[in-house]
Each structure stands twice: as C-alpha cells, then as structure tokens.
Amino acid sequence: MSAITIRAMTIGDYEEVEAFLAVHFFKQEPLMLIPQEDPKQSEVSSAEAELHRSLIPQDLSLVAVDGERIVGVVLAGELVPEDLEREYQEAEQKEITCLLDKIHKFLAGIERQANIFKHYGVERALYLYMLGVDVSIRRQRVGTRLVEATIELGRQRGFPVVTSTCSNQNSKRLMTALNMECILTKDYADYKDEHGEIVLRASEPHTSASVVAIRL
C-alpha cells in the first residue's frame, strides 16, 4: 500500500509547488524542451507563476504527498464560456516573447475550437490546468490517482464536466484511460508563423495536443 496521500493544495504550499513544477513539469514537458534561439525564451515567466498562485484559493488544486514532501501536483480551476474567448483574444494580441507565449497561443486556439461548453451543453467546467509527478516515482499511478481525485472533486463540487488540454501523448494516454473523451486533436505542425515556418517543432511522439473531457 502506497504511503502517498492526496490532499487539497493550500496557499502555504505555493513556494514548494513552484519549486516542484520547475523540476518535475517544466523540465520534463516535451513542448518546453523545444530548443529556442535564445535559451532565456524557455524560462517560466512571472505571469505564469502568478497564474498558478491565483488558482489555489479556488480550493480545486491538489497535491500528492509522501510524508511532508510533495511528489505530485494538480493545478485546477473553474472555467466558464467567456474564459475561452477572453484567453484566445489575449493570446492572439499578446506579443510573443517566450516559448510559453507560443504554447499558450496554440492551446488557447484549440480550446476555443473544441468549445467543450457547446459540446456538452454546459455553462461551467472544472479545468485541469497542469499535472506534474515527481520523476523518481513515475509509473506508480500517482498521476492517475491525482486525475481520479480531480474528477471526484469536480463531482463533489457540482461541476457537470471536467476538462483538460493534453500537450503530450503521456497525459492523453493517462486521461483517456480514465474514460475522458477526446474532443479535438491538432498537430503542432499546423501552427506556423507569418513566414510559413512551424512555430512548435515538437518531437515524436508528442506532436499534437488534445482537448479531453468527461461528463460527471
């Protein structure tokens, strides 16, 4: 029986969560490993860190802990239809200065196109924004347990749908194994700049992103 337990994330976890994600998410996520002309473009912006902090007070984010040590993280928050259009417009209008800007622009586009609200006929959803697991305990079902706990939390809080956008094949495989439906998949190669150059040159097999969801 695993000693790893799952509990609600608190604002007191914030600093440790950010340190954890720096190692176990941003240095592992295939999209973040795409080489950039300037290595500084791969750094995580303060705006991204502030987004993480802003989600915690919603009491929808979780941590997996082994004793006192965080070994897994889910950042999640409520999503409403207006968010899709607002985030898309913000991403379209924002000057791209780093790799995360490029990623956010692509993902905002696919989420707007998938439109899980229209797909399911609902007005709110629990959005699983980020899933990270300690690299030393991969394949011990910690990620699966975190997603299962997020789905159960969504059910308890009265959300009609839980959704996420999988940026790599590992997360897509994990979530579809939990009966999450794949609403839309788009290849990164379809995202090109004004010169026709591919913006996100992702490596196999992580060459597409997928919006997944489950009705509760």
UniProtKB/Swiss-Prot annotation:
UniProt protein name: Arylalkylamine N-acetyltransferase-like 2
Catalytic activity, reaction form: a 2-arylethylamine + acetyl-CoA = an N-acetyl-2-arylethylamine + CoA + H(+); serotonin + acetyl-CoA = N-acetylserotonin + CoA + H(+); serotonin + butanoyl-CoA = N-butanoylserotonin + CoA + H(+); serotonin + hexadecanoyl-CoA = N-hexadecanoyl-serotonin + CoA + H(+)
Presence of keyword Transport: no
PANTHER family registered for this protein in UniProt: AT07410P-RELATED (PTHR20905:SF1), N-ACETYLTRANSFERASE-RELATED (PTHR20905)
Classification via CDD domains: NAT_SF
Gene Ontology terms, MF aspect: acyl-CoA N-acyltransferase activity; acyltransferase activity; aralkylamine N-acetyltransferase activity; N-acetyltransferase activity
The organism of origin for this protein: Drosophila melanogaster (Fruit fly)
Pathway note: Aromatic compound metabolism; melatonin biosynthesis; melatonin from serotonin: step 1/2; Lipid metabolism; fatty acid metabolism
pH dependence per the entry: Optimum pH is 8-8.5.
Tissue/organ expression: Expressed in all stages except early embryos. Expressed in thorax-abdomen.
Family from the record: Belongs to the acetyltransferase family. AANAT subfamily.
InterPro entries in the cross-refs: Acyl_CoA_acyltransferase, GNAT_dom
Chain positions of site Regulates catalysis and binding of the amine substrate: P30
Gene of this entry: AANATL2
Record key words, sorted: Acyltransferase, Transferase
